[in-house]
Regions:
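Outer-membrane beta-barrel domain signature, especially the mid-to-C-terminal portions
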Residues: 54-62, 96-119, 151-183, 218-244, ...
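Conserved small-residue
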Residues: 26-28, 36, 115, 132-239, ...
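Transmembrane beta-strands of outer-membrane beta-barrel pores
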Residues: 16-20, 90-96, 131-133, 147-153, ...
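Extracytoplasmic gating/loop element in the C-terminal half of outer-membrane beta-barrel translocons
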Residues: 267-354
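Residues on the lipid-exposed face of transmembrane beta-strands in outer-membrane beta-barrel proteins
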Residues: 1, 14, 73-77, 88, ...
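Outer-envelope beta-barrel architecture signal
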Residues: 6-10, 82-84, 137-143, 245-247, ...
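Solvent-exposed loop/turn elements at secondary-structure boundaries
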Residues: 2-67, 85, 89-120, 158-164, ...
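Outer-membrane beta-barrel signature, preferentially recognizing the C-terminal barrel domain
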Residues: 40-85, 113-136, 173-190, 240-245
Length: 354
C-alpha cells in the first residue's frame, strides 16, 4: 500500500466447503410396506379372497445424504481513495452422489425410490463493481453493477441418454432444465416444395407429419442425422430454461437534499418453451388454437398466405393434429428469454435538520 497510493485495499480469498442435502429421502424409505386388498369374484369360505401387495414403492437401504462440494476463489479490492470498490469470484460445485429417480423396466411392477446415481457439475464467475464520487460541494453520485455467468451439466444419471422432445428437467450430458426439439427448416412455400418434403419424410416419421394435415405454409424440419427419416434421432439440444447470464446495474445521485436512484436488472442466454393446456401457457405458443379462446395478438397479420409468404406463423388452425405438428418443440417454437428491465426508481427529498 505504501508503494501504490491508488490501492487502498486488496484481499485474495479461497474457500472449500461441503454441504449435505436429504431432499428425496423419506423417513421410512428403508422399510418395505405391504397392504391387504380384498378381491372381487369367488368367495373363499365366508369371505372373498384377500391378497397381500406392496404399497407401490420398493424399499431402499442404500440411499444417503448428498455431499455437495463447493470451491470458491475471490478477490476484493478498493481503489482511488475507495471511490472504486468491487469483488470478483470464480466458483465450482460438484455433486458425485446426487439423488435422482432411476428408471427400471415396467415389468418390475413398483416404483423405485431415489438413488445416489447422479453426478452433477456447476461452475461460473461473478463480478461486482461500484464507483462513487463527488462533484463540487453539493453533488454526489454513484454507479455500479453486477454480472454473473453460470453453467452446469448433469454428467451421469446412471441411465441410457436418450433425448426426448420438450422440457426435460434432468438429461444426462446436458444442463438441468434443458429443452430439446427439432431443427426448423423453413416453411413449405409452394406445392412442389410440399410434395417433395412429403415424399422424403412421410414414411416412417414419428413427428406427426401426415399428408392430409400438412398444408402450404406449414413448418418443415431438418433431417439432422441424414438417415432419410424424421424421428427422435433428429432431436437436438435447444437451450436451457435457466439463464446462464444475470446482470444488474444501478445509478444514483444526491443534490441539496434531493436523491434519485435507478436499478436495472436482466438475464440472458435463457431459452423458453411454453407448455401447458388451453388454460395455461399454450395459448401464448399456439395462437387461435380453439374457438372463443383468449389468445395474444402478436400473430395478427403475421400468418402465412400466398400473399404473405414471409410471415412468421403458419395459417391459423384449431385442429389439434396440425397445431401439434407445427408448434412442437423446435428451434422455431422456442423463444429467447433474454430481457432487461427497469426494476426500481426512487426519487426523494430529505428535509433539512433544524
Amino acid at each position: 500500500q505504501n508503494h501504490a497510493g491508488w490501492l487502498n485495499f486488496l484481499k485474495i480469498r479461497a474457500s472449500y466447503g461441503e454441504v449435505g442435502n436429504q431432499s428425496g429421502i423419506d423417513r421410512y424409505d428403508g422399510t418395505q410396506f405391504y397392504k391387504f386388498e380384498s378381491q372381487s369374484g369367488a368367495y373363499i369360505g365366508p369371505n372373498k379372497g384377500t391378497i397381500i401387495d406392496t404399497n407401490g414403492k420398493i424399499a431402499s437401504l442404500g440411499r444417503e445424504w448428498e455431499r455437495i462440494k463447493n470451491y470458491n476463489l475471490g478477490l476484493d479490492f478498493s481503489l482511488f481513495n475507495s471511490r472504486l470498490t468491487g469483488t470478483a469470484e470464480v466458483y465450482m460445485k460438484r455433486n458425485d452422489n446426487m439423488l435422482i429417480n432411476v428408471s427400471y423396466p415396467g415389468v418390475l411392477g413398483d416404483n423405485a425410490g431415489m438413488s445416489n446415481n447422479g453426478k452433477f457439475r456447476s461452475h461460473g464467475w461473478e463480478v461486482m463493481v461500484n464507483w462513487s464520487d463527488k462533484i463540487g460541494k453539493d453533488f454526489t453520485y454513484h454507479i455500479g453493477g453486477t454480472y454473473s455467468f453460470n453453467t452446469n451439466k448433469l454428467t451421469d444419471i446412471g441411465a441410457v441418454s436418450v433425448l426426448k422432445s420438450g422440457f426435460v428437467d434432468k438429461q444426462q450430458g446436458y444442463p438441468l432444465n434443458s429443452i430439446f426439439g427439432l431443427r426448423y427448416a423453413g416453411k413449405a412455400q409452394t406445392e412442389e416444395e410440399r410434395q417433395k418434403y412429403l415424399y422424403r419424410f412421410l414414411t416412417g416419421n414419428t413427428i406427426g407429419l401426415t399428408e392430409q394435415n400438412f398444408r402450404l405454409g406449414d413448418n418443415m424440419y431438418a433431417d439432422v442425422n441424414n438417415d432419410g427419416k424424421l424421428d427422435q434421432n433428429d432431436i437436438v439440444y435447444l437451450g436451457t430454461d435457466d439463464p446462464k447470464i444475470s446482470f444488474s446495474f444501478n445509478v444514483g445521485a444526491e443534490w441539496k437534499g434531493f436523491d434519485l436512484s435507478l436499478v436495472f436488472q436482466g438475464a440472458a442466454q435463457r431459452t423458453i418453451f411454453r407448455t401447458g393446456d388451453n388454460n395455461g401457457n399454450e395459448i401464448w405458443r399456439i395462437p387461435m388454437k380453439a374457438l372463443y379462446l383468449n389468445t395474444s395478438n402478436q400473430s395478427v397479420g403475421n400468418t402465412w398466405s400466398p400473399e404473405n409468404r414471409g410471415a412468421y406463423y403458419p395459417t391459423y388452425s384449431n385442429k389439434n393434429e396440425i397445431n401439434d405438428y407445427n408448434y412442437q418443440a423446435s428451434s422455431w417454437s422456442v423463444e429467447d428469454g433474454s430481457y432487461i428491465r427497469l426494476k426500481n426508481v426512487e426519487l426523494g427529498y430529505t428535509l433539512p435538520q433544524r
